[in-house]
Amino acid sequence: VGWPTHLEAIHEFARVLKPGGSLIINSCSPVQMEMGFWFYKLIPDAMELAKEKIIDLETLDNLLAKCGFMEIHREIPLELVLQGDSYFDPEGLLDPEWRAGDSIWSLVTKDNLAEVLVMGEELQAKGELFSFMRRHDRSRAKTGQITFTYARKAVERL
């Protein structure tokens, strides 16, 4: 892939930042996509489409270094949940407004959405929707949902 648009954007960050200036990038890593969102298990095709557009963290580090950034490090706030308390509402899956809180749903086909809604309604009817959410949310505690990458533009030497 080569990530040409990412490289172009990072070059622009380097161009406009003063020497010694800081850059903070928040992103969701491919692993976080797979492990950090309980409902992504229901929409694997959409998740794969989204992952195609997400740069892995090692490649991001390499691009930052290539563009003159240094002191590259990252933080993963494991306690941060992007949708807040509503993320833990398993019935939100059935609510279009809840789904509008995550852009991944725009990648879900109408047919797949219909299947997901039927599955959600069946789990709800059997009283298993909450346990489904809890079971598939366990891995989030280890991966988090978002990564903050910090880098500093190198200071020009005379």
Please provide the spans of the model-predicted regions.
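Glycine/small-residue-rich loop that forms an oxyanion/phosphate-binding "nest" at active or ligand-binding sites
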Residues: V1-G2
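Residues that cap or flank secondary-structure elements
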Residues: T5, K51-K53, V81
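Conserved class I S-adenosyl-L-methionine
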Residues: S22-E52
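A structural signal for short, well-ordered beta-strand segments and their strand-loop junctions
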Residues: I24-I25, E71-E75
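Short alpha-helix
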Residues: E52-G68
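Conserved Class I S-adenosyl-L-methionine
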Residues: H73-L158
